[in-house]
Amino acid sequence: MNAKTDFSGYEVGYDIPALPGMDESEIQTPCLILDLDALERNIRKMGDYAKAHGMRHRSHGKMHKSVDVQKLQESLGGSVGVCCQKVSEAEAFARGGIKDVLVTNEVREPAKIDRLARLPKTGATVTVCVDDVQNIADLSAAAQKHGTELGIFVEIDCGAGRCGVTTKEAVVEIAKAAAAAPNLTFKGIQAYQGRDAAHGQLRGPQGQAGRRHCPGERGRGRAGGRGLAPEFVSGGGTGSYYFESNSGIYNELQCGSYAFMDADYGRIHDAEGKRIDQGEWENALFILTSVMSHAKPHLAVVDAGLKAQSVDSGLPFVYGRDDVKYIKCSDEHGVVEDKDGVLKVNDKLRLVPGHCDPTCNVHDWYVGVRNGKVETVWPVSARGKGY
């Protein structure tokens, strides 16, 4: 699904949380809202940064799962394409008109490989990560079957302990196999540090996270020395892009959360000790929630609980206020400490979620707000696309 302009037949509250032209106070809750001004500033800022540092930026769609947000990242921020984690995510973006798709994950099940090999028929350029020679053979066979071409990134484990090879020899072996396989092209190296790479680190030249880049450097050097110079060394998330872009190794970034921000990223500080969500980036994503009960004088209950957010990275914080605090939640309820009794039933609060990616995945819509008015409503196009 792409951005809608015709909402005839949609019932507010049942089908959709709001319609363009409504006041923010009229939005049905709990739902996701986007501060469009902040979102656009974040997108432009990352695009300007990448350009100034001679880097390509491929925005990570697993964060927002939205064709419309991705198109905004391409038009305003110069994103060259989208990263996805699942074949079904890639299908949603390709079918939605995104022309360059990188699956930053391994695809091994035969049925999924077959779906991936068909995807270039949508007109999209499709690339996938590999960490095993047998996977090369399987991808090549499927691409030949469908008469398509697939790009290959060899994935290096940069310390996350997940997918990816750990030796230079393995990089060369897989790159050689990809270069020789029919209907496949060896394009480069995937070396992504992950969300936690810079947590607890200073974001400046004195930070230590940059030391993790040596696997990407070794992999590029060894492959290039065998006549298999990678076109791209890709990686670098919101928590570590500073290091990749100044490493002299990478030429493509894969940032995602920068566009929305969340409470967990707010724990990262820049070289001056400031939170990166209060200066470097802006909070653009919020869970809008309403007070539904204030039976206890010091506690307000809101309608955003576990089913409206992910708390794997901590509880949300109440945006723009230090007089109230979100302190706990259950399935359908959130409890807000209100020591001074300032909240009233039906008051609305903006919550900054602890972790944006899985929070977005439990909602159907983004409500885009500017100056207190609903300007647009976008579907979460790849919501639930985990297969």
Swiss-Prot record:
Q: How does changing the pH alter activity? A: Optimum pH is 9.0.
Name of the protein in its database record: 3-hydroxy-D-aspartate aldolase
Modified residues annotated as N6-(pyridoxal phosphate)lysine in this record: K62
Q: Which cofactor does it need?
A: pyridoxal 5'-phosphate; Mn(2+); Mg(2+); Co(2+)
Q: Lyase: is it a keyword of this entry? A: yes
Instruction: Give me the ranges of the annotated region Disordered.
Output: 199-228
Instruction: Describe the temperature dependence.
Output: Optimum temperature is 35 degrees Celsius.
Work out whether the entry's keyword set contains Nucleotide-binding. no
State any GO BP term from the record: D-serine catabolic process
Task: Give disulfide pairs as residue numbers.
Answer: none
Q: What is its EC number?
A: 4.1.3.41
Q: What SUPFAM superfamilies does this protein map onto?
A: PLP-binding barrel (SSF51419)
One Pfam entry for this protein is D-ser_dehydrat
Q: Note the subunit structure.
A: Homodimer.
Query: Which keywords describe this protein according to UniProt?
Result: Cobalt, Lyase, Magnesium, Manganese, Metal-binding, Pyridoxal phosphate
Reaction(s) catalysed by this chain, per the record, are:
(3S)-3-hydroxy-D-aspartate = glyoxylate + glycine; (3R)-3-hydroxy-D-aspartate = glyoxylate + glycine
Q: Which GO terms describe its molecular function?
A: D-serine ammonia-lyase activity; metal ion binding; oxo-acid-lyase activity; pyridoxal phosphate binding
Q: Which gene encodes it?
A: dhaa
Q: Which residues bind Mg(2+)?
A: H355, D357
Q: Which Gene3D superfamilies match?
A: Alanine racemase, D-serine dehydratase-like domain
Identify its protein family: Belongs to the DSD1 family.
Q: What does this protein do?
A: Catalyzes the condensation of glyoxylate and glycine into (2R,3S)-beta-hydroxyaspartate ((3S)-3-hydroxy-D-aspartate). Functions in glyoxylate assimilation via the beta-hydroxyaspartate cycle (BHAC). In vitro catalyzes the cleavage of both D-erythro- and D-threo-3-hydroxyaspartate to glycine and glyoxylate. Also acts on D-threonine, D-3-phenylserine and D-3-3,4-methylenedioxyphenylserine.
